[in-house]
Structures are given as structure tokens and as C-alpha cells.
């Protein structure tokens, strides 16, 4: 790193002597071209030395002096200074006003969209509501009919349930009579012994 700096300083020291040595116009033109070339070489050497020094410094510091990091830090500081300045505050106020205007416009658009959806839904729901109203209007007339149908069904059920009654009653009476016929017979009591003062036997013949 010291070698390019030394060469640059030597060229700068030799440049005034080279410029003052020419006496004629041709010598002055040639010396000016030589001066431009020397200045370009000096600039190239300085840029090379700066790049090498920066690379070594970044490697030794663990990337702290890396160009990307330094550029990001410089841009962040510049932006903070810009927003802190009066023009920056004015721009920030304009941006906030623009954002609020956009929010209001978005809310109005959403409200308009909701209103359109509600209107479309109401128009589509009108036929259904009309049919429902018609159904509700016809339902009072159908209530007596349904009541009569329910009454008829109850009557038929009573008839169906009540029809086996006499048959079952007749069947039970016949069964009772058959039992009585099975146990039918003649019964006689011998009261002669009791009339004589003795204890007679009660004989029952079936």
C-alpha cells in the first residue's frame, strides 16, 4: 500500500519540473498530453491503493467496513436527516394526507359495493317473499281442511279400534258359558241327619 502512494507523490513532485522544462508551443502540447497521462496513471494508482486498503480493513474488522454495510448506514442516516428537515416534514405530511384520502376513497367504494350487493339481493329476494306471503295467505284456508282431515282420521281410527270390541266381548261370554256348561250338574244336600240332630254330610254331585 505504501508503494503506490510513494509513486504518486514522486510523480506529483516531478510534474512541475516537466511542465516548466518545455519552451516552445510543440513542447507545451506534448507536455500537456504527458501531464494528462501521468494524472490518469496517478488516479488509477490511488484508486487501486484505496481498494486494497479498504478490502484489508474490511477483512480485519469482520465485515464492519464492508461497502454494502457502509452504504446502507449512509443511506439510512441521509434519509433520517431528510425526514427531519422542513422539506422532509412537508413531504411526509403530503404522504399522510394522500394515504388518508386513499383510505376514504376505499371505504366509499366498499360502501357503494355493499349497497349494490344489498340492492341486488333485495331484488332477487322479492319473488321469494311474494311466494311466502301467498303461502301465508292461503294457510288460514288450509287450516280447517287439515283439522277436518285429522278429525276424520281420528274417527276412522276409533271405528277400527272399536269394531273388535263386540267380538271380543262375545268371545269372552262364550268362553264363560262353556266353562259353566263344563261344571254344570246337580247338587243335593242331605238334611235328614241334621233334622234328626246329627251331623250329616253335605254331598254335592256335579
Curated annotation (Swiss-Prot):
The chain crosses the membrane at residues 34-54. Phosphorylated on tyrosine residues. GO terms for biological process: defense response. It is found in: Membrane. One of its GO terms (cellular component) is plasma membrane. The modification Phosphoserine is found at residues 99, 153. It holds the Pfam family PTPRCAP. Residues 98-173 are annotated as: Disordered. Keywords: Membrane, Phosphoprotein, Transmembrane, Transmembrane helix. Residues 161-173 have a biased composition (Low complexity). It is a single-pass membrane protein. Its main location: membrane. The keyword Secreted does not apply. InterPro entries: PTPRCAP. Interacts with CD45/PTPRC. This is Protein tyrosine phosphatase receptor type C-associated protein. It comes from Homo sapiens. The gene is PTPRCAP.
Amino acid at each position: 500500500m505504501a508503494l503506490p502512494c510513494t509513486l504518486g507523490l514522486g510523480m506529483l513532485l516531478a510534474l512541475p519540473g516537466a511542465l516548466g522544462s518545455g519552451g516552445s508551443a510543440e513542447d507545451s502540447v506534448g507536455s500537456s498530453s504527458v501531464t494528462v497521462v501521468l494524472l490518469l496513471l496517478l488516479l488509477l494508482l490511488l484508486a487501486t491503493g484505496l481498494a486494497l486498503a479498504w478490502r484489508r480493513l474490511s477483512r480485519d474488522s469482520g465485515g464492519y467496513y464492508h461497502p454494502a454495510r457502509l452504504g446502507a448506514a449512509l443511506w439510512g442516516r441521509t434519509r433520517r436527516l431528510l425526514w427531519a428537515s422542513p422539506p422532509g416534514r412537508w413531504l411526509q405530511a403530503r404522504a399522510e394526507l394522500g394515504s388518508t384520502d386513499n383510505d376514504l376513497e376505499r371505504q366509499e367504494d366498499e360502501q357503494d359495493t355493499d349497497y349494490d350487493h344489498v340492492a341486488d339481493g333485495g331484488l332477487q329476494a322479492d319473488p321469494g317473499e311474494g311466494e311466502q306471503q301467498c303461502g301465508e295467505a292461503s294457510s288460514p284456508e288450509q287450516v280447517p281442511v287439515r283439522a277436518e282431515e285429522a278429525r276424520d282420521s281420528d274417527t276412522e281410527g276409533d271405528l277400527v279400534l272399536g269394531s273388535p270390541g263386540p267380538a271380543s266381548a262375545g268371545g269372552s261370554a262364550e268362553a264363560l258359558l262353556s266353562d259353566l256348561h263344563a261344571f254344570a250338574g246337580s247338587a243335593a244336600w242331605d238334611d235328614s241327619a241334621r233334622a234328626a240332630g246329627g251331623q250329616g254330610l253335605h254331598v254335592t254331585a256335579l
